[in-house]
C-alpha cells in the first residue's frame, strides 16, 4: 500500500455521496488513492472524475469507474459528454469483494488512466476528455470510504526526462530537445556508489506486446551484475539473478503477485539494505533479494533494456 505520507490533501471518512473540488490540476503523473470497504448489501458504487458539479444539466464525466456486483460482477468505465454516455468499456477481472477492504490507485497518464486495485493492475482507460478539465471528484453508491488522497506530479511524459543522481554513459542516450523517453538499451553511472540506504527508481511504461525487460545494477569495472531484475510478461515470472565471474547464478522466481501487465505505467523502487535489496512496484512491496555480490560500493551502474518505454531514472 502507498504510504499516506506520500499523499496530499487527504480526506478521511467522507460522507457518501461525496462531491468535492480537486484543488490542483490533474496532469500526467498525478495519483489518486482511494481506500474503503464494500458493504455486504452493495450492488454497485462509482468514482467519477468530473468537469464541474452541475446537476442540471449534468456535469461532464471524463472518467466513470463503476464496479457492479449484482448479476454482472464487473467494472464498467465510460465518459459522459453533454449528458450522453459513450460506449462502455467492461472489465470482468473483478478485484472487489463484498465485506472486503480495497485500495484503488488511479494514475493519470498522458493518453489514459491507469487503475490498480490492491496492488494489482486492473485496467487502462483512454482519455475521451482532456484530463486537465477535471476539477471535481464524485463518489456515489453503496460504499464506505476511509480516505481519499492525492499526489500531484509534474508531467512525466511531456517534459524532458530527468535523470537525477545519474550520469548517462551511452552517447545515444543523451536527451534531445522534445524527446519523450530515454533510448534503450540505457546505461547510466550512479553519482554515488551503491550501499545501505541507497535508492534507485525506474519509471516506465510496458509495451503493448511486451515479452520481457530487465533492470540491472552493475559493478562497472568488473561488469558483474549484482542485481538482475527480469519481469517476463509472457510467463508472468519476475526473475531475479546475479551474473558473477562470467556465470549466471540460480534464478529466484517466488512472488506473491506478478505486478506487471502490457500497457501499464510503473514505478519500480529498488532499496539497498545491509543484507538485501528490497523492490517495490507502484508503491507495493514485491520482493527481497539477498546480496550475492558483497562489495556493494563497487556497484556504480544502472542498465535497462527490453520491451518498455523508459520515462525516468533517479538515484539518491
Swiss-Prot record:
* Residues annotated to bind a beta-D-galactoside: 248-254
Q: Which residues bind a carbohydrate?
A: 68, 78, 88
Question: Where is this chain's protein located in or outside the cell?
Answer: Cytoplasmic vesicle; Cytoplasm, Cytosol
| One BP annotation, GO | cellular response to virus
- Which comment does the entry carry about domains? Contains two homologous but distinct carbohydrate-binding domains.
Please give the InterPro entries that the UniProt record associates with this protein: ConA-like_dom_sf (IPR013320), Galectin-like (IPR044156), Galectin_CRD (IPR001079)
Annotated keywords: Autophagy, Cytoplasm, Cytoplasmic vesicle, Lectin, Repeat
- Specify the protein name: Galectin-8
User: What are the GO cellular component annotations?
Assistant: cytoplasm; cytoplasmic vesicle; cytosol
Identify the residue position(s) of the site Critical for binding to sialylated and sulfated oligosaccharides: 58
For this chain, one GO molecular function annotation is: carbohydrate binding
Please provide an example of a Pfam family that matches this protein in its UniProt record: Gal-bind_lectin
Residue stretches making up the Galectin domain: 18-151, 186-316
Q: Which PANTHER family match?
A: GALECTIN, GALECTIN-8
Query: In its keyword annotation, does this UniProt entry include Lipid metabolism?
Result: no
Coiled-coil stretches: none
Assembly and oligomerization: Homodimer. Interacts with CALCOCO2/NDP52. Interacts with PDPN; the interaction is glycosylation-dependent; may participate in connection of the lymphatic endothelium to the surrounding extracellular matrix.
What organism is listed for this UniProt entry?
Rattus norvegicus (Rat)
Q: What is the tissue specificity? A: Expressed in liver, kidney, cardiac muscle, lung, and brain.
Amino acid at each position: 500500500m502507498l504510504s499516506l505520507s506520500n499523499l496530499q490533501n487527504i480526506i478521511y471518512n467522507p460522507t457518501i455521496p461525496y462531491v468535492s473540488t480537486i484543488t490542483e490540476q490533474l496532469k500526467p503523473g498525478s495519483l489518486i488513492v482511494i481506500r474503503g470497504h464494500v458493504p455486504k448489501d452493495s450492488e454497485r458504487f462509482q468514482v467519477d472524475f468530473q468537469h464541474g458539479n452541475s446537476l442540471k444539466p449534468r456535469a461532464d464525466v471524463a472518467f466513470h469507474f463503476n464496479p457492479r456486483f449484482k448479476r454482472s460482477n464487473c467494472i464498467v468505465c465510460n465518459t459522459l459528454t453533454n449528458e450522453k454516455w459513450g460506449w462502455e468499456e467492461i472489465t470482468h477481472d473483478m478485484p472487489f469483494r463484498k465485506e472486503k477492504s480495497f485500495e484503488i490507485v488511479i494514475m493519470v497518464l498522458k493518453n489514459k488512466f491507469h487503475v490498480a486495485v490492491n496492488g494489482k493492475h486492473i485496467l487502462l482507460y483512454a482519455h475521451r476528455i482532456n484530463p486537465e478539465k477535471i476539477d471535481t471528484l464524485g463518489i456515489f453508491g453503496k460504499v464506505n470510504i476511509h480516505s481519499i488522497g492525492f499526489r500531484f506530479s509534474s508531467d512525466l511524459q511531456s517534459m524532458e526526462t530527468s535523470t537525477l543522481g545519474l550520469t548517462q554513459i551511452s552517447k545515444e542516450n543523451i536527451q534531445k530537445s522534445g524527446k519523450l523517453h530515454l533510448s534503450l538499451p540505457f546505461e547510466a553511472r550512479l553519482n554515488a556508489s551503491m550501499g545501505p540506504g541507497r535508492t534507485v527508481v525506474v519509471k516506465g511504461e510496458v509495451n503493448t506486446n511486451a515479452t520481457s525487460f530487465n533492470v540491472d545494477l552493475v559493478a562497472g569495472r568488473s561488469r558483474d551484475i549484482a542485481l538482475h531484475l527480469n519481469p517476463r510478461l509472457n510467463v508472468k515470472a519476475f526473475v531475479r539473478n546475479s551474473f558473477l565471474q562470467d556465470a549466471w547464478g540460480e534464478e529466484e522466481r517466488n512472488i506473491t503477485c506478478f505486478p506487471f501487465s502490457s500497457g501499464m505505467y510503473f514505478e519500480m523502487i529498488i532499496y539497498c539494505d545491509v543484507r538485501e535489496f528490497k523492490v517495490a512496484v507502484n508503491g507495493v512491496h514485491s520482493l527481497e533479494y539477498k546480496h550475492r555480490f558483497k562489495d556493494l560500493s563497487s556497484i556504480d551502474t544502472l542498465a535497462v533494456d527490453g520491451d518498455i518505454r523508459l520515462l525516468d531514472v533517479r538515484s539518491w
